[in-house]
């Protein structure tokens, strides 16, 4: 026994529960052992503080022993050099984790993992405290260390459970202390690791986990949650993409906290009539320069903006204001920081051991092992946690293409084929289907949006039909083609007209979102306005025309912050947007236009009810490359509302008496013109109202004769 006690006191792998705590003696009494390095004296007391037995310091430093003659619970009175502590003995408690939960996690159950792992407030009998639980199957020993035990790796070794799980209940621990796990690897190294399932963390660059508060937040968004019905008539979807740390900053160039963001961002989004905010990843991440796309704390909102409850208050306020919240969520890879998931228990655990499978060369990050059920449970649990605990309305899953292909970013010989010899990552496909299946089953109406840049078939098709089951997919092809077109001098555009029209060949193959995202305004490209050709007048005109064309085009909308008022420069994640630009009338004009585009989208069923259905779209002019003119009809395929005609003239010359075929006779009204003086244009247009002529054109029985302002998009709508 002395050797075992010495090993225990030295922090070596020992079954602590076999040695510490109460153990029956042959005469009916109990022997109690406690490990408390640094303590000066110790006694056993009852619940009222009455001394039951004095503990004797053994010959092994830090180990105290005593004999308890009575039955029932006891507490410890520990005399430290600077205080006296009275607390229950952690090693007097039975297991607190149901084995069935651990078996469910081992089978890939994310809901079970949410309930079991991390720092969970529980009550053992009458005693409140925190149960710490972690998965580390290759470890010889795991201890929890933190502010509550002086970060002494010897003090609180955990109990090993089936499947490589470890748990320990620490009585009377409350919210707020920092903690980590001290993981002893098979080779004897002791690794200090943050909790993979921590619900709260300390502010980077510090890396400890934090015991969270109890779940007492009082939500007030019941009305919003009740209307989240997947069977309802399609609604407008217009997303404002936001990097919370740089949308606006305080006077010291620090990120705003959640209450201040709610106070400033929500009214702004309401003013511009966006339906949703999409946040770049706020899962805790060590490196701010990753924009959140290299996270390690998949269950915790970053501490950069305050507490988890602060984030809940932000979402609640968005919902009360009628704004949905989507989170960019990263399940493709993770960084190799020493405190994180990499080699978590001394061996490849969350990642593949073979770097041909386990490392992203492009990003120098590690790839999750989707073939391991506990890993997929970890990822599924994270997704469900954000949707359930924080009432999120959607997840935009990052870098899906990198998940789907084993040879993504790799040369020949640098990747491992699947079981059938192919390049598809079959385990990742199964995981993505399971992710979408569970979200749809548990949280119907929640969006799942794939950032998928290849032609993988059926990203938004039903799983039963062989698809991946996402509700939406980013249309990267449309974005690349149309931006490339708009960046050309108008005199050259006639030779590249197909870049505008090709997207309509496949526009209804998936449920697409048209993304003008953060990726388009970094790495020296300049802001969206800065990418437009010509002098300042032409740049603004091009931008306005492009945005209106985008809002009329089939597909839901996403616009990154700053584009809505014409930021010139690259986005800089370390500083605020250039809000001073709104002192200029043309920048205010772009902002007014975006608000009007969203208002038009919201009140025009023709623009959103058929946005994913070919029956909601008809060409009028697709082939006028010489004049760089595009014209099409949008209408509600179910017969509601009235049709809308969108016409873009993307040359610098006005066109007069330009004939466009339309499907309905009578009066048509110009409802939006990006060349309006209201938006900073030259104010050339169609005087509000026009009548059709009974002359067939472009496959329609009627035509309109239009004035097309230069570098402009106009909308006309048939009068009822």
Swiss-Prot record:
SUPFAM superfamilies: (Trans)glycosidases (SSF51445), E set domains (SSF81296), Glycosyl hydrolase domain (SSF51011). Pathway: Glycan biosynthesis; glycogen biosynthesis. GO terms for cellular component: cytosol. Its EC number is 2.4.1.18. The active site is at 398 (nucleophile), 451 (proton donor). Pfam families: Alpha-amylase, Alpha-amylase_C, CBM_48, GlgB_N. It comes from the Bacteria. One of its GO terms (biological process) is glycogen biosynthetic process. One of its GO terms (molecular function) is hydrolase activity, hydrolyzing O-glycosyl compounds. It catalyses: Transfers a segment of a (1->4)-alpha-D-glucan chain to a primary hydroxy group in a similar glucan chain. CDD domains: AmyAc_Glg_BE, E_set_GBE_prok_N. Keywords: Carbohydrate metabolism, Glycogen biosynthesis, Glycogen metabolism, Glycosyltransferase, Transferase. Gene3D superfamilies: Glycosidases, Golgi alpha-mannosidase II, Immunoglobulins. Monomer. Catalyzes the formation of the alpha-1,6-glucosidic linkages in glycogen by scission of a 1,4-alpha-linked oligosaccharide from growing alpha-1,4-glucan chains and the subsequent attachment of the oligosaccharide to the alpha-1,6 position. Belongs to the glycosyl hydrolase 13 family. GlgB subfamily. NCBIfam families: branching_enzym, PRK05402.1, PRK12313.1, PRK12568.1. PANTHER family: 1,4-ALPHA-GLUCAN-BRANCHING ENZYME (PTHR43651:SF3). This is 1,4-alpha-glucan branching enzyme GlgB 2.
């Amino acid at each position: 026994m002395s050797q075992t006690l010495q090993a225990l006191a030295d922090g070596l792998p020992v079954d602590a529960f076999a040695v510490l705590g109460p153990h029956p003696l042959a005469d009916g009494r109990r022997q109690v052992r406690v490990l408390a390095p640094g303590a000066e004296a110790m006694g056993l007391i009852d619940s009222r503080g009455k001394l039951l037995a004095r503990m004797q310091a053994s010959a092994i430093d830090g180990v105290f022993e005593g004999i308890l003659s009575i039955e029932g619970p006891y507490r410890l009175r520990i005399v430290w050099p600077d205080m006296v502590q009275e607390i229950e003995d952690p090693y007097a408690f039975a297991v607190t984790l149901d084995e069935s939960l651990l078996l469910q996690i081992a089978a890939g159950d994310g809901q079970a993992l949410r309930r079991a792992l991390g720092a969970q407030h529980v009550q053992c009998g009458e005693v409140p405290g925190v149960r710490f639980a972690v998965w580390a199957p290759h470890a010889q020993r795991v201890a929890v260390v933190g502010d509550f035990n002086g970060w002494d790796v010897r003090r609180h070794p955990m109990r090993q459970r089936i499947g490589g799980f470890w748990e320990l209940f620490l009585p009377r621990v409350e919210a707020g202390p920092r903690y980590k796990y001290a993981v002893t690897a098979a080779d004897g190294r002791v690794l200090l690791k943050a909790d993979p399932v921590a619900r709260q963390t300390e502010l980077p660059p510090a890396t400890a986990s934090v015991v969270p508060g109890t779940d007492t937040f009082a939500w007030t968004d019941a009305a919003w949650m009740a209307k989240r019905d997947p069977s309802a008539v399609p609604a407008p979807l217009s997303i404002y993409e936001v990097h919370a740390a740089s949308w606006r900053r305080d006077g010291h160039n620090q990120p705003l906290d959640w209450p201040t963001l709610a106070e400033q961002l929500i009214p702004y989004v309401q003013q511009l009539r966006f339906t949703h905010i999409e946040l770049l990843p706020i899962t805790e991440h060590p490196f701010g320069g990753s924009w959140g796309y290299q996270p390690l704390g998949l269950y915790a909102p970053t501490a950069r903006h305050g507490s988890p409850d602060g984030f809940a208050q932000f979402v609640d306020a968005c919902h009360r204001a009628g704004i949905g919240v989507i989170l960019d969520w990263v399940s493709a890879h993770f960084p190799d920081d020493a405190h994180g998931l990499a080699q978590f228990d001394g061996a490849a655990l969350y990642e593949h051991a073979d770097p041909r499978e386990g490392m992203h060369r492009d990003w120098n990050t590690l790839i999750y092992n989707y073939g391991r059920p506990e890993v997929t449970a970890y990822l599924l649990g994270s997704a469900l946690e954000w949707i359930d605990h924080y009432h999120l309305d959607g997840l935009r899953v990052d870098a899906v293409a990198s998940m789907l292909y084993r040879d993504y970013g790799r040369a020949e010989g640098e990747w491992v084929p699947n079981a059938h010899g192919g390049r598809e990552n079959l385990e990742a496909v199964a995981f993505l289907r399971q992710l979408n299946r569970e979200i749809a089953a548990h949280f119907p109406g929640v969006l799942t949006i794939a950032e998928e840049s290849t032609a993988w078939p059926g990203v938004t098709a039903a799983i039963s039909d062989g698809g991946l089951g996402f509700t939406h997919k980013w249309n990267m092809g449309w974005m690349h083609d149309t931006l490339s077109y708009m960046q050309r001098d108008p005199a050259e555009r006639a030779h590249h007209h197909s870049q505008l029209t090709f997207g309509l060949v496949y526009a209804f193959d998936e449920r697409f979102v048209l993304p003008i995202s953060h990726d388009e305004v970094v790495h020296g490209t300049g802001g969206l306005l800065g990418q437009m050709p010509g002098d300042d007048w032409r740049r603004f005109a091009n931008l306005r025309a492009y945005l209106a064309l985008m809002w009329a085009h089939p597909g839901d909308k996403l616009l990154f912050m700053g584009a809505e008022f014409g930021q010139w420069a690259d986005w800089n994640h370390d500083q605020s947007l250039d809000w001073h630009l709104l002192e200029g009338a043309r920048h205010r004009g772009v902002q007014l236009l975006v608000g009007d585009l969203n208002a038009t989208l919201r009140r025009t069923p023709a623009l959103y009810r058929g946005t994913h259905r070919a029956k909601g779209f008809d060409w009028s002019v697709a082939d006028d490359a010489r004049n760089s003119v595009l014209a099409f009809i949008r209408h509600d395929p179910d017969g509601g509302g009235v049709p809308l005609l969108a016409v873009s003239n993307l040359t610098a010359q006005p066109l007069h008496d330009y004939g466009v075929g339309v499907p309905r006779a009578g009066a048509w009204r110009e409802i939006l013109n990006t060349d309006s003086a209201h938006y900073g244009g030259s104010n050339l247009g169609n005087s509000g109202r026009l009548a059709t002529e009974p002359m067939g054109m472009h496959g329609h029985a009627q035509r309109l004769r239009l004035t097309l302002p230069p570098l402009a998009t106009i909308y006309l709508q048939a009068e009822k």
